[in-house]
Amino acid sequence: LRDHPVNKARIAAGRRPATSAWFWGQGSRPGLANFEQTYGIKGAVVSAVDLIKGIGKCADMQVIEVEGATGYIDTNFEGKAEAAIKALDSCDYVYVHLEAPDECGHRREAQNKVKAIELIDQKIVKPLLDALAGQQFKMLILPDHPTPIATATHSREPVPFLLYDSTETQEGVDSFTEVNAQNTGVFVERGPMLIKMMLN
């Protein structure tokens, strides 16, 4: 690329040269295991993010489209909760992916990141808990990765997770925070173990 005429013209114009090519788009379908055959339960995905929907499709999960799902703080939270609740009529497991806190982290919008988490609490978690009240169920809540405001990019630190079982009572943790999660001493070495913990 260094000697390409386009780069020579860019450098002559005082612009930075292109130093790499990133091919994005078409490809072949990855060989993911069928979710139902792997775990013995039927699953669905609710997300605005094409990557997440694609993973769901590749795992032969039901992918649910929600009108107004944007992946940002203006997403249709209520619609996602309603879709998840409805999906539980025919599925055993629903993965609801919410991108808003991550996007706010990338934009260094601390107030909106807090607001996004509060909206998830109010408009996703609470309606799901209300709809499932009196039933036996588990709910796993976690970010897929940290996106600290300070760096505005993904980082490698372990993420906190909350695994709720409607049949058990736990004492000693009164809120879901990184510090409280760390203080439990529970650490999952490999991410795929989380779903196994949830299903046991």
Task: Describe the role of every protein-language-model region.
Residues L1-N200:
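Feature captures the catalytic ectodomains and active-site-proximal regions of enzymes
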